Amino acid sequence: MSDLSNTPFSLLELSPMKEHETVSQTLANSVTYAQTADKLGFNRFWMAEHHNMRGIVCAATSVLIGHIAGKTQNIRVGAGGVMLPNHPPLVVAEQFGTLESLYPGRIDLGLGRAPGSDPITSRALRRDEQRAEHFNDEVTELQALLGPYKGDSPVRAIPGEDTNVPIWLLGSSLYSAGLAAKKGLPYAFAGHFAPRFVEDAIALYRREFQPSEVLDKPYVMLGLPIVAADTDEQAQFLATTAKQRILALMRGKPLWLKEPVATMEGLWTAQEKMQVENFLGLSVVGGQASVKHKLSMIKQTLQVDEFIFTNDLYELSDRQHALEILASIMN
């Protein structure tokens, strides 16, 4: 098994919401969660971008990044990620250049090309699907806007210029892996919801990686769903919250956090069970020893440099306790 002592642990936050909770309460919980991660020595705290999804309140990603960075001390805070075809590269450069100026050395910019929502909402965002086909060009444009001014463009990101905010490429496909390799950028694979191509994508990225000004060797961060508790049995019980959430997603229902249940039997069909389990195929669920063993095996098998975890538990206290367990493994 691989040693985890030198493997950074990070968090991906979607600001999950209970049905009768206010947005203010949910966001306050995300801040408390981030502060716990900060005190425990986690490496990054990234906010996702999702629109028009009841039960998830991370639509204004850059606003939340600024708020959380201001409430924490050391942890890197960033986007996991900005769906670039939803936004003009200049606006993204200005936003993240501002964040980097406010919180120097603590801001990350992860980029994806998915809508982050359904087709109707995409149209409301004025998203042009053809822009997704030019994702490579827009990443290059954004890199130029955040880099030093070279005197050959009438458009400059002020603030943003020469902040060199670290850019990551996010994805769950061979395309994203290949593009990250070609550009010499760090790569984050979305194993927390799309584990199907994880082995092929990481292998492709490492095989085709081309050193760049920002990275001399490949760097892989893997997203995983995590449920860590005092015992394996308690973790399996708490994991039913995430299972109910994914079941709701597949049924087109709101994604409220639901209380854990003793059994999922009767809540899903056999086909739905298979679909949910495939979705959560890389889930790491268990007590400290089980979690440590599973993470060590995944690191060794997939050659992972860093883990970034989703942690969809019903109670904030359980989410915080999961972080304490992870920190004990990390340290």
Outline where the language-model segments fall.
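Active-site mouth loops of central-metabolism enzymes
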Residues: 13-28, 82-90, 161-171, 279-288
